[in-house]
């Protein structure tokens, strides 16, 4: 029965039962972490053989005859460029292979734009009277942290199952020259798990920005992170942008952080020829080369993009049961109460849960006191301010399958808060 249909007496009885369950959870002294999309130990163990690919007897000369131990090749070795180019569906000349973190590449891209501008800028963003960024919400907290760090004004754009509200995006981008960029996680978005529709990608590619130096930050973090056999597919934005003469408008990012070792993987930028030249010129003042040994290690381990895609099946075998378990428990224990809604993603690392308005912070607090750490309520919005206080991001990847069940079962005890709120309304 939906809670809103219960009498005051039924609500009281249900609340008391929830409190009892919650107290039982607290007494177990659980210490469970669902706060970040971290690979679990089993996933990390999968990549251990990669550490044996190179040793002191290995040839560290790449296919072009480059000794990867030495300086040089700022934008990465050819073999790594080809692997990522095949993965993202672009030409290898469009790839800059960076260090271990795509987040660093994104931060540096904003920093360069603020200090020097981007290709096509008449002046640095930092010398403009105002700089604005569009932020699809709910979204990735670390994206918002970057733009907040640089004092960039962030504007919420609601997400839909097809992607950001493109009517709003077009209105703002095409008419406000202060709008310099937008954050996008186009495939299995964080946290909703939505993949942008073909129409959405085409509308992005066809934007007519009022700012000549507007950029789409296309964070394709989950491009191969499928959970289902009938997985989503994403239209290639560069192919569409070229049709509109807009290929300079896009910065695409990807990494192996959730493929091999987070913090010890390989990250890339994909961009137009003009952007690659502009970025490389500035990057050359900052760096001589990234870790080419690690680039070679990854290439030899996977062989090619198809080898990497096949490897992702192993991740799916570990992650899919955890996601299925969380969805099953939410459905069994909360499905009839009409107080939570959630998505069932086909890939990515998160499940987005929405409470009734005004309840997310309290739910997160109760979870924390019960030993379950969630991403902070509000974190999926700029400035950590969820206007409706309703969105919670669940990250099932890190706990074991058994603990994933424990994590989610605790949510059953949390409607006591909602019971109380509904009873007060009555």
Describe these PLM feature segments.
Residues 15-26, 275-276, 280-281, 350-393:
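Conserved C-terminal alpha-helix-loop-beta "cap" of PLP-dependent enzymes
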Residues 313-327, 339-354:
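Conserved glycine-rich beta-strand-loop-beta hairpin in the small C-terminal domain of fold type I
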Residues 98, 239-320:
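Conserved core segment of the aminotransferase class I/II
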Residues 1-64:
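Conserved N-terminal helix/loop that builds the PLP phosphate-binding region
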Residues 66-212, 223-245, 360:
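Conserved core of the PLP fold type I
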Residues 2-3, 8-14, 58-60, 64, ...:
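PLP-dependent enzyme catalytic core of the Aspartate aminotransferase-like
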Residues 406-426:
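Single conserved hydrophobic/aromatic residue that forms the stacking wall/gate
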